[in-house]
């Protein structure tokens, strides 16, 4: 199984939050973890913002960013192409998604259609999770998540 992580899921692999343990276990069970190229900028920005907002966590967040940098080359990275962003635009319209959420969904769909292995989609946004289900994706969800 390939685990596709949107940015919220990717951050949970590096920053200890509710749900991190379950997601880390899922990532450990996967044959590969896939991400969209934009997840790099989004994840680094999220960690930097949190470090500014909670200065006491800055050192741990710097370490998390360094681990992300070290691990990045091990991920299956889906490139952002014209075809992908056009598909993302369709998904934004069809599923009422935010721009980058629709790009994440289109990237996951690209991996799913490549069909090398089953894909499981990990995210922490209910609307995005629902759209992935409509597209026939297996969705990672913690107990109690819709």
Where are these regions (language model features)?
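Short, contiguous hydrophobic alpha-helices characteristic of membrane insertion segments
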Residues: 11-17, 75-80, 121, 135-138
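Acidic, PIN/NYN-like endoribonuclease modules and their adjacent C-terminal/linker elements
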Residues: 2, 106, 110-146
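Short beta-strand scaffold positions
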Residues: 35, 79, 99-102, 122-123
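Short active-site oxyanion
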Residues: 1, 30-33, 74-76, 116-120
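Short, well-structured N-terminal submotif of metal-dependent ribonuclease cores
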Residues: 1-39, 50-63, 137, 143-144
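Acidic catalytic patch
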Residues: 40, 70-95, 102-107
């Amino acid at each position: 199984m390939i685990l596709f992580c949107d940015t919220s899921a990717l951050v949970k692999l590096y920053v200890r939050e509710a749900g991190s343990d379950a997601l880390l276990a899922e990532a450990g069970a996967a044959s590969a973890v896939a991400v969209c190229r934009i997840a790099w900028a989004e994840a680094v920005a999220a960690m930097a913002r949190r470090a500014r907002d909670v200065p006491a966590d800055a050192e741990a967040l710097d370490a998390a960013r360094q681990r992300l940098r070290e691990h990045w080359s091990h991920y299956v990275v889906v490139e952002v192409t014209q075809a992908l962003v056009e598909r993302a635009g369709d998904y934004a319209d069809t599923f009422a998604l935010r721009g980058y959420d629709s790009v994440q969904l289109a990237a996951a769909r690209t991996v799913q259609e490549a069909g090398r292995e089953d894909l499981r989609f990990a995210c922490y946004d209910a609307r995005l999770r629902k759209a992935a289900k409509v597209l026939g994706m297996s969705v990672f969800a913690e107990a109690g998540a819709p």
